[in-house]
A protein has these predicted regions:
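Beta1/beta-strand and adjacent pyrophosphate-binding region of the FAD-binding site
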Residues: 1-12, 28
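Extreme N-terminal leader/targeting segments of oxidoreductases
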Residues: 1-4, 19-23
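Short beta-strand/turn micro-motifs composed of small residues
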Residues: 8, 31, 96-97
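Glycine-rich FAD pyrophosphate-binding loop
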Residues: 21-41
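Short, flexible, mixed-charge acidic loops at enzyme active sites
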Residues: 39-45, 132-136
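Dinucleotide-binding Rossmann-like beta1-alpha1 core, especially the glycine-rich loop
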Residues: 45-129
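Helical element adjacent to the flavin cofactor pocket in flavoenzyme catalytic cores
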Residues: 144-159
């Protein structure tokens, strides 16, 4: 008998199953597409970031990045002795017009409290850091260094 049954094998379901099983729980995942050929998560870009509005999401993003860095050790098995997330660390640039700037300034307070490493830049200064970006209509922008955000191979989590 299973201790926990998880409906849905997306990244949240798979991660929940992984951590519960590490605690000794017997876990079953029920997924409507066990091949994952049409499932949403493996078809996504596999992005990971820490630029969110809520503290919980910021902290979860930081945790995910650290977990991804530890994958070669945490997920190795006899069958797969050198697992990799095929991580590409490239950072994220998020841009906001006047209508969303105040909300982003409030979010930056959460970023600071969570030590997210987010940098803020005025839209008028954007071309100095990102000369290839058209900053017309941009009030403010946030970005992180290239090591803290990026994307992974989502199929790896289901292999």
């Amino acid at each position: 008998m299973d201790d926990v049954v998880i409906i849905g094998g997306g990244i949240i379901g798979v991660a929940t199953a992984y951590f519960l099983s590490k605690e000794g729980r017997k876990v079953k995942i029920i997924e409507r597409d066990p091949t994952y050929k049409t499932a949403s998560f493996p078809l996504s870009l596999g992005g990971f970031r820490r630029q969110f509005f809520q503290k919980e999401n910021i902290l979860l993003g930081k945790f995910a990045r650290e977990f991804i860095y530890q994958i070669p050790e945490l997920l190795k098995t006899e069958k797969n002795p050198k697992p990799t997330a095929s991580m590409v660390t490239n950072g994220y640039l998020l841009m906001f017009g006047k209508e969303h700037a105040e909300e982003q300034y409030r979010a930056l307070e959460n970023h600071k409290e969570c030590d997210a490493g987010t940098k803020n830049i005025k839209g008028s200064e954007l071309s100095k850091v990102f000369p290839y970006v058209n900053s017309a209509g941009i009030e403010t922008a946030t970005y992180t260094d290239n090591q803290s955000e990026g994307w992974i191979d989502p199929f790896m989590f289901h292999s």
